[in-house]
């Protein structure tokens, strides 16, 4: 991402070598390229019941820097409603219970997005997604009990890394992602010209 994507307006998609560029007029919003396959996560998912239970400790319930976020926002009824919270293990893992109301590739990516940010420490240090590399192996079915796991990675200055994984009701891996998050002032982060 190069700029916060404006919502509910048409953006332009332009070919760019082996990838595409997403623009809003003259403003570059995002670039997408193919990447090498991601390694399979080595962590073990918690159960759906365990993920649901830790959701009551979701830090975004008391203070959320972006409460209208589609994935994890608390002021968004049409969103995914993810409530990622620490599972209390020695890996720093976070988990979120998720029962999809609709399923698509963009929804799968959205499910893999924010849990990584919360595991990287977004509470008390607002961050936005800088880059995300994701791979979906399969999509869940509407109504299935899924778990999204996330783990913090390295950090340097304002840059924080995370990884996340989406698991189906039997613990099967449905998708994985790696992300870079950038610490920001949330009052200064908004779509250009809006």
Q: PLM features: residue spans?
A:
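Hydrophobic beta-strand-centered segment that forms part of the acyl-chain substrate-binding groove
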Residues: 1-16, 108-109, 113-148, 152, ...
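Generic structural motif
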Residues: 4, 16, 25, 37, ...
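Non-catalytic linker/capping segments at the edges of enzyme domains
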Residues: 16-103, 194
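A short, polar/proline- and glycine-enriched secondary-structure boundary/capping micro-motif
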Residues: 31-33, 105-108, 186-188
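A generic structural signal for well-ordered coil/turn residues at beta-strand boundaries
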Residues: 92-94, 130, 175
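Accessory, usually C-terminal, subdomains that scaffold auxiliary metal cofactors
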Residues: 134-193
């Amino acid at each position: 991402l190069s700029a916060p994507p404006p919502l509910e307006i048409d953006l332009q998609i332009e070919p760019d070598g082996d990838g595409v560029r997403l623009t809003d007029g003259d403003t570059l919003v995002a670039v997408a390229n193919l990447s090498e396959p991601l390694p399979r996560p080595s962590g073990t998912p918690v159960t759906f019941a365990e993920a649901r239970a830790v959701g009551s400790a979701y830090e975004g319930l008391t203070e959320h820097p972006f409460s209208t976020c589609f994935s994890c926002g608390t002021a968004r009824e049409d969103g995914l409603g993810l409530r990622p919270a620490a599972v209390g293990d020695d890996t720093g893992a976070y988990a979120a219970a998720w029962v999809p109301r609709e399923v698509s590739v963009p929804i799968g990516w959205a499910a893999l997005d924010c849990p990584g940010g919360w595991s990287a420490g977004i509470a008390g240090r607002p961050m936005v997604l800088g880059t995300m590399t994701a791979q979906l192996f399969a999509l869940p079915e509407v109504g299935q009990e899924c778990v999204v796991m996330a783990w913090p990675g390295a950090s340097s200055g304002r840059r924080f890394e995370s990884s996340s994984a989406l698991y189906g009701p039997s613990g099967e891996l449905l998708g994985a992602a790696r992300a870079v998050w950038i610490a920001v002032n949330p009052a200064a982060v908004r779509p250009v010209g809006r």
